[in-house]
Amino acid sequence: ETLEVLEPVELETRGTLRDEVQLLRALALLALDRPDAAADTLAGWESKDGMAPFAHFNRAVALVRSGRPDEGLTLLDTVGRDPVTPAPLRDRANLAAGYSLLETREPDRAAERFGRIRLEGPYATQGLLGAGWAAADAGRLEAALGPWTRLTTQPAFDPAVQEALIALPYVYAQTL
């Protein structure tokens, strides 16, 4: 239904508004689990305005979800390193890249992405959790203790903190 509403709007608009409609269309396609179509929608993104990093991030997510992880990770890496990109979006791109790399059993590359996430940002706890999992997946259980122990100082209602609280006893038992 959302796509039907956006279709005539997209045809009649120009410039920034057209870019916004294009991004909304891609987000709707992602929500409908149509990542190939979402990636294609954002493939020709030419705008250089403030929306570009968001379009690139969402295209990267669509590429990863559509089975093209190498292309998606390359784009996530670009967004995650770009100083023009807003810091929270850089963190989110690095978080997405880190967890994608954990899924493909590349813990060392994942750890590098998690290490780029700011400790004072909105994705800090998820980044610390991921850093711990990257260390654990690489067989460095003692290295997982650092980020997970740091998480225990955060509010316990955070799911990343809860997961670390569950993982810590296992790691302690294995390393003693």
What are the language-model segments listed below?
Residues 1-176:
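Acidic, polar-rich low-complexity tracts and alpha-helical solenoid repeat scaffolds
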